[in-house]
Amino acid sequence: MLSCRRLPILAVCLASVLSCVTLWAYKDFVPPHPENASTYPSKDVHSNEKVTAAIDLYNAAPKDQIFSTPYSQYGILPVLLIITNDGDQPISVNNMRAELVTTGKSKLEGLETDDVFRRVARINGSSTEPTHVGPIPLSGNKNKKAQKQYDEITAARFNAEAVEPHTTRSGFLFFDVQGVKQPTAGAHIYLTGVRDAGGNELIYFDIPVIPSNAAQP
């Protein structure tokens, strides 16, 4: 049998191990390095404007391991959006809208940071002494984990306001696919609201989700 003296030591060791596991599980998010959008299978090239938009799904291993939060388990589809501007003038994407349209005609708009966070943090609105992560109240015992989740979502989301000449910008779109049948097979992602330097809106981007690039969530 273990002596009473050894029990406190074992407890301390176990606590240290659990602490290390927790720190590892919620490591700082490191975004993937984007290539030129023209190199991805799922893309739409606007030759006249010299702008290409592409997507890459991050809903299955090994790619989804860059996240600490298993978004697919919460019914959320993470999609890396890559936009390359090979022209000589900047383009504006601050009012860009993204929509996922499935073969079943479901139309899903990209989620805001708070929408993603509420799902993965499983917000409990009954807390009597809430603290806040971003604009959202949380009970104290959830706050540290939730802060890591919120920081990851904020760091991951596509947040560029413009794509400068001869530059590539990237970031994640998040879609709520909970309960949606075949959300990726045969689906398309549409981008609207992209404007040139003169304020003129470009023709919408229609990016097919290619089957080889689309692991089902």
In which residue ranges do the predicted regions lie?
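Conserved functional micro-motifs across diverse proteins
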Residues: 22-217
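Bacterial N-terminal signal peptides
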Residues: 10-20
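Bacterial N-terminal signal peptides that target proteins for export
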Residues: 1-12
